[in-house]
Design a protein with these regions (language model features):
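A short, acidic, amphipathic alpha-helical segment used as a generic capping/interface helix at domain edges
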Residues: 39-49
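A short acidic, glycine/proline-enriched capping/turn motif at secondary-structure boundaries
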Residues: 61-63, 89-91, 112
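Flexible, charged surface loops at secondary-structure boundaries
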Residues: 48-51, 99
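Non-catalytic interface/targeting segments
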Residues: 1-41, 98-112
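Mid-chain, well-packed structural core segment of small domains
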Residues: 53-85
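C-terminal structural segments of small proteins and small subunits
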Residues: 81-109
Length: 112
């Protein structure tokens, strides 16, 4: 569960992260691959390998990160539902889906 999010910082299970993060179920890791607000398929390898029902992409506090259409299409062809939201909303959606018992993963951008 994501305890909180504010610009530049996540708190997950009581631990602070001042970087982008990936989440798979209740596991969290720093994600340092995202460069210049651009996503690539490589950013999603570990998430796809976990075989989630849903992947949430947190696009930053102001929604600056824009996932390319090709990435969304690739994920959907894998049978994965994709939700793209500003990071604050994406955190709430992640927690809600996790509470519902969904197999969910996420990539969350921590700043703009």
């Amino acid at each position: 569960m994501i305890d909180s999010y504010k610009f530049g910082e996540f708190v997950v299970q009581g631990k602070k992260f001042k970087s982008n993060i990936t989440l798979i179920g209740d596991k969290v890791k720093e994600h340092r691959h995202l460069q210049n607000h651009e996503l690539s398929l490589d950013d999603f390898t570990e998430l796809v390998n976990a075989k989630p029902e849903i992947i949430i992409i947190g696009t930053g506090a102001y929604g600056v990160v824009k996932p390319p259409k090709e990435i969304i299409e690739f994920l959907e062809k894998q049978g994965i539902k994709v939700i793209v939201e500003k990071t604050g909303s994406a955190c709430k959606t992640y927690n809600s889906l996790l509470k519902q018992g969904k197999k969910v993963a996420a990539l969350m951008h921590n700043t703009c």
